[in-house]
Amino acid sequence: MWPWLERIASACWDRVRRYALTRRDEEDGSGSGGDADDLLLWSRDLVRHAAGEFSFAVVQANDVLEDHSQVETGAAATFIGVYDGHGGAEASRFISNHLAAHLVRLAQERGTISEDIVRNAFSATEEGFLSLVRRTHLIKPSIASIGSCCLVGIIWKGTLYLANLGDSRAVVGCLTGSNKIVAEQLTRDHNASMEEVRQELRSLHPDDSQIVVLKNGVWRIKGIIQVSRSIGDAYLKKQEFALDPSMTRFHLSEPLRRPVLTSEPSIYTRVLHSQDSFFIFASDGLWEHLTNQQAVEIVHNNPREGIARRLVKAALKEAARKREMKYNDIKKLEKGVRRFFHDDITVVVVFIDHELLQDGDESTPEISVRGFVDSGGPSSFSGLNGIS
């Protein structure tokens, strides 16, 4: 077959295949509209941002949703935040209410966005939450044990700024010349299951033989927590927030000599390339059940509409399969009970339309979309329109 004819045939077949997949999903209830009876699954599609569109989905497993998340759109910039809380929702909720505002304030003061500004926004958020802990821990000691992972992406002037604490993850789907999609992980997982993280902790704490402990087949810091970086978790950062023996799960047998967790984010900068098709931002509940490559292939091979929801459901189906169950069985379970089968999961898929990235789109709606909240509000990122 002539090369030009082969390319046309391939493109036509790709469209037919995608249509068939969509029809199949509509018929078997696995598409975005076929699971209205899963009351713990929320989604929002498709919303414009300055350089394309995004799809957003959250499923609740815990009795109280510990994942908080947001997308802020403006004519000049787009902000994506995924905050996977643990021990409670206070830290993830606090981040959702303050981090983007700190970033906008600092960017306006400096007249730009940079790695330092992102780092300082994280620092201000950590300081603010620790101040809250200091004011309330005598009344509610457990707040010292509450923390959150924090994954943030900012798209501004053709560049993606990424910052990460914990094991939420950002992955890019890159198109090859043969129209194949390849996953590239952009963030590092700060989790004690990773050998490099254990080595880092041991080098920072050479006098502490219990800095990482293998407990019931899982590596944990001080035998308690898996993530090595977070907002909050004050009891593992400052001795003043040590918890007494009555809270056995979080009690340390010896006084804290130095912080064992840090709030210093890993920061990455990526100039967007023409082959960067989309980005997936997700809490670890997704990555527990799907590989990076599986996730990008699902996005690449299906319509944009409902794609974040589709990813969440793919993870839930895999979680069900591991327990020799079906997704239909899991979605009938109540919140709290579902946590025995899967975690809270947040997914934001951000599509990049490179024509918009180059030319800009001043008509982009400036809105704030929050996970599991149906109504949108004004975006704080409208304040970035004037910076150069």
From Swiss-Prot:
Cofactor(s) it depends on: Mg(2+); Mn(2+)
Residues given in the record as Mn(2+) 2 binding sites: D84, D284, D343
Organism in which the protein naturally occurs: Oryza sativa subsp. japonica
Reaction(s) catalysed by this chain's protein: O-phospho-L-seryl-[protein] + H2O = L-seryl-[protein] + phosphate; O-phospho-L-threonyl-[protein] + H2O = L-threonyl-[protein] + phosphate
Superkingdom of this protein's organism: Eukaryota
Enzyme class label: hydrolase
Gene Ontology MF: a single term: protein serine/threonine phosphatase activity
Any one GO BP annotation for this protein: regulation of intracellular signal transduction
InterPro entries referenced in this protein's UniProt entry, alphabetically: PP2C, PP2C_BS, PPM-type-like_dom_sf, PPM-type_phosphatase-like_dom
Family per record: Belongs to the PP2C family.
Binding-site residues, Mn(2+) 1: D84, G85
Annotated keywords: Hydrolase, Magnesium, Manganese, Metal-binding, Protein phosphatase
SUPFAM superfamilies: PP2C-like
Cofactor binding annotation: Binds 2 magnesium or manganese ions per subunit.
Protein name as catalogued: Probable protein phosphatase 2C 43
PPM-type phosphatase domain boundaries: 53-352
Known EC number: 3.1.3.16
